[in-house]
Amino acid sequence: MRIILITGISGSGKSVALNVLEDAGYYCVDNLPAQFIPDLACYLADQGYSQLGVATDIRSRESLARLPDTVRELAANHQVQVLYLTASTDALVQRYSETRRRHPLSAQVDVGAAAGTPNDTSLIEAIEKERELLSPLAESAHRIDTSNVRTNTLRSWIKELIQDENENKNSQQLTLLFESFGFKHGVPSDADLVFDVRSLPNPYYDLALRPLTGRDAPVIDFLQSQPMVLAMAEDIRAYVEKWLPSFIADNRSYLTVTIGCTGGQHRSVFIAERLANYFRAHGNVLVRHRELAPAG
């Protein structure tokens, strides 16, 4: 059975991710304590199910410490993947303000507040407390930073992860994820490697290229004509290729390589696509452009 466990910070999009799994045919359960997952997997396997999605988070606080042991137990008989969703504190505060919902830990840090009344100070304390409690889980999971991500973009990312795992379900290879981003929107917190390409010639200053992206032919032609761009792309490729065996030896499932320019529209997109095209010949590769709307 293939099992995807979704955990992470409250308000980061776990419900969206679980809904994508459900739409993809997974048997999904929300807020299930970790100690019950093996029995559920066994029961569903006996019933003929082959895919299970489970969300577990701070609401099942007492059982979260058992999750690493549960994952090891499940991995003995099943294909298991853990997704950890997170977001910046500012993004989470804004989301809670918009929905008027209370954080699961709010009662512990703001017992005097009226029910249903957001309090930025206590909310920030609750978010940081949750981040601290969940930090051990983030270290061993595939992290997804949703800070500047629209809901439809997150759905597309989860679909890509599912598709990648389906295509490589019998493979133990590490998956390389190349992600472009704009520094003005913040560095992705799920990055394993961060490369800054802001020193490269910028197509933004060409009015004909400004509305385009690094996936469009005119921008590609412009950047490919710049020796500095090609040299930096080659240096990044060489670095990743040299150290990739070390990351594989560390038993990682994913390595997230992020490339940032100023706005995340041109240079970083071009470099990410170029690297992805090269490394596809070496194994499992995904490419993601945080600041661009998903295709289609």
Swiss-Prot record:
Its transmembrane ranges are none
InterPro entries per UniProt: P-loop_NTPase, RapZ-like, RapZ-like_N, RapZ_C
Q: What GO MF annotations does this protein's record show?
A: ATP binding; GTP binding
Q: Which SUPFAM superfamilies match?
A: P-loop containing nucleoside triphosphate hydrolases
> Can you tell which superkingdom this protein's organism belongs to?
Bacteria
For this UniProt record, give its keywords in alphabetical order, as a comma-separated list.
ATP-binding, GTP-binding, Nucleotide-binding
Binding of ATP occurs at: 8-15
Binding, GTP: 57-60
Recorded family membership: Belongs to the RapZ-like family.
| Record's protein name | Nucleotide-binding protein Rmet_0297
* Native organism: Cupriavidus metallidurans (strain ATCC 43123 / DSM 2839 / NBRC 102507 / CH34)
